[in-house]
Design a protein with these regions (language model features):
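Domain-scale activation on soluble regions of proteins
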Residues: 1-163
Length: 163
């Protein structure tokens, strides 16, 4: 997304900062939930319970993936790729714990979330968020690939046993 904008004209895009951050954060959350629904060994009602009790908690969702998805498909949680994805999830989660900083200007007590004027590098932050989404999508794709292979092996075995 970031590459599509004119590098010289980022000053006019300051109004895009919060929507960009919100959309990427929401994408990260939905990708994690997708992994849980599609690749977890839990029953659908158990997955729904996990997702409902951890609605916007990116770190908790990633922990459930580490415990309930990665071991099934023999994905190593100590792999640098997965460790970095988890570290990036922690960074994003610690900045926006309940998915409201980018959605609303104030909290429930009518206090502004951003009291200080901070300057963020639009391109760097966008690249960071996009990389995180791509990393989680990569984990999902690898788990799906391995899930398909296991299903194919099971079908071959069942076919072999029937003959």
């Amino acid at each position: 997304m970031i590459e599509e904008f004119d590098q010289e004209n980022f000053s006019g895009l300051s109004h895009m900062f919060y929507p960009m951050c919100y959309l990427y954060r929401n994408d990260v959350e939905l990708l994690l939930k997708t992994i849980l629904f599609k690749c977890s060994s839990l029953r659908i009602d158990e997955v729904c319970k996990v997702v409902h009790s951890n609605k916007h908690k990116i770190v908790k969702l990633f922990e459930y993936i580490e415990q309930g998805v990665l071991p099934i498909y023999e994905l190593d949680a100590q792999d640098d790729f997965i460790k970095n994805a988890k570290r990036y999830c922690n960074i994003l989660h610690n900045f926006d714990l309940d998915s409201s900083k980018f959605r609303y200007p104030i909290n429930k007590l009518c206090e502004p979330y951003m009291r200080l004027i901070r300057y963020y590098d639009f391109v760097e932050l966008g690249t960071f968020l996009e990389s995180l989404c791509n990393a989680i999508d990569g984990i999902h794709n690898e788990a799906e690939y391995r899930k398909d292979i296991l299903a194919e092996i099971a079908a071959e075995y069942a076919n072999y046993m029937n003959d």
